[in-house]
Amino acid sequence: MLAISTGLTLMPPIGRRTALKLIAGSVAGSMAWSAAPWVRAATAAPAPDGRAGDAVLSIGFDKRMHTRVWRRGKPLTGWQPSEALLLASGDVTDFALVEQTAHVLDDPRHGAGRQAVFTGRSRAAGVEKQVSVSSFDAQPGLALLQVRYRNLGDVPLEVTGWRSSAYQLDDAPGGFWSFSGATHTDRRDWVQPLAADFDQRNTLAMDSSDYGGGTPVANIWRRDGGLAVGHVEPVPRPLDMPVKRTARGASIAVESPKALTLAPGQELVTERTLLAVHEGDFYAPLQQYQVFMRGEGIEGPRPPDSAFAPIWCAWGYERDFRVEQIYATLPKAKELGFEWAVLDDGWQTNEGDWKIDRRKFPRGDADMRAFTAEVRRHGMRPRLWLAPLAADPGSDVLHDHVDMLLLDKEGAFQTVTWWNALTQCPAYQPTIDFYVELVKKAIGDWGFEGIKLDGQHLNAVAPCHNPAHKHASPEDSVTGLATFWNAIYRAAHDANPEAVVELCPCGTAFAFHNLPATDQFPSSDPLSSWQVRSKGKSIKALIGERSSYAGDHVELSDNRDDFASSVGIGAVISSKFTWPKDTDRPSVPLPPGGFVLTDEREALWRRWVGLYNTHMLPKGEYLGTLYDIGFDKPEAHAIRKDGAQYYTFYAPRWDGKVELRGLPAGRWQVRDLFNETDLGVVDGGAVATLPARFERFLFLQATPAGSAA
């Protein structure tokens, strides 16, 4: 992990706690080579063709230790210097291969597998390179790599970083698409086609003061398949996953930009990185990553049933709401079928103190208890909005507990731009204790049944150099964020085992390492319906059957009414409608027509909430590999539930055939659920097709012919 060591030692399986210790130790240069963090069962004969991997993915090494990737026996890339040490004097890419060894793996978490270790030397640079390639039978097409560089010379080497799994895919008809798990401050799409000038660094470090982190996977794919790269460490690591359109195709890699001095005899050890080959879009490699990390001990909790209930949020009334406005809307929200009522931003005096605003709740705690009681009286569940780790200028906590602040190496603050607030350190125990007590009070005393944790700064933080915190390493804040969320999650569930903890890191690419502390992810301020759907497909791959993904307020979607982009992909529906009228004190001009529930909107809302509650597709099996979200037209999503299969197609306009993929053999009755129209019977087994004409969406259900829907 950009570690420096002086010996070769096989290590036991690495868990989160061990990794934290090693990262702390690496600053002083004491981390050992860990090319074999999985249990070896025996030594094996190396492959005579210089390849490592399995029948789906194999990586070949030539005499210079350049590599080539094969998928199912066919070359996917050319020979390329995929692993390189980056020096101030230039990149070291050529190493004379001197040794190859092989081992059989029998790991208690990942099962049987194999490992090959390739060793080479660069005489010119005075560097030895050792590359470990591990694969497991349960994960065909996925390889885990780790590289060790040793300074064999007599003078220090000024290292500027390293690069692994650097490959170019040649151009092909239709071009390329890419998924990026890294956060960008401009909240760009996670899934994009690669234009001629496409060039993204995809850093997992901070992109700006309050935007950073993400899921450590990126990929590129053509119509015939693609490559994914990333890392499999149990804690966040500040690596880059650059993707670029080139003159000949598209390139991808994993890189570390961290500079260090490598003394004679010392070693640099990289993070454990992944390389995967796949067909179709990004769903398959993300799902492989999710399964692998589950074996490493990182997985989401199984959320309570209430995490799938429709959500009404009072944010339509904004911060300057009146409690009476919320109370007046509850009967309508319940009538339409919404189960949650979210008290959003504005109940508090400021971000930081989290004291009740007595202008809205004059009796303080008593009024908050009365609020939750009123929500329950209408047969709904109350949820409370919070934005932890932010302290507003002028707040008491900023004055009385300035020690909580996260500081950079110059002693400067990290800012949260949305609230013009300052970031608090999640790895400082007084900070943790403060927010744990706040959550316990909100759920255990006030009676809220869920917490909405909101803000882009919640996804990742910068290294903390505050001397008051006595961190073993500045990276403690980075790796400690997931621990902070675990403490919040435990506090909420200790107070109410059925509580729902929602994490909404606005506009960011969700940090996978925060997953164990999250019952529900929304699409987090989507900029379009495309973001609702493409984020949803990503999250369903990363959480799997434990998924509660919400489409966020439908008013953020195209035309401010696109429930189809949530319902059709199995996302929880949400709305911030107002009723019987809009706020008369908006902070910004309302959109045309506002958010008020007109008669026309009410009819549409009622229809979609009814369809959602009737079919409850978030509890179905999302069939993410059936369609390629980039290349298949129209865009399609499929879900299997209770013996039926659901298909939703999306396009501005479509007039042609649609394919119903994945139908088992037999006769299937197809129904247009939104328009309540039977479309006939198709044969399963092969790919069934239907003629279709629609605008925006087509929402279909296929049931065995002769059965009741």
Which residues are covered by each model-predicted region?
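Polysaccharide-binding surfaces and accessory modules of carbohydrate-active proteins
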Residues: 46-242, 673-678
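Beta-strand-rich recognition/accessory modules
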Residues: 49-53, 121-123, 202-301, 566
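Active-site-proximal substrate-binding groove within the catalytic cores of carbohydrate-active enzymes
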Residues: 266, 270, 485-679, 689-691, ...
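Aromatic- and carboxylate-enriched substrate-binding clefts and catalytic-loop regions
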Residues: 340-548
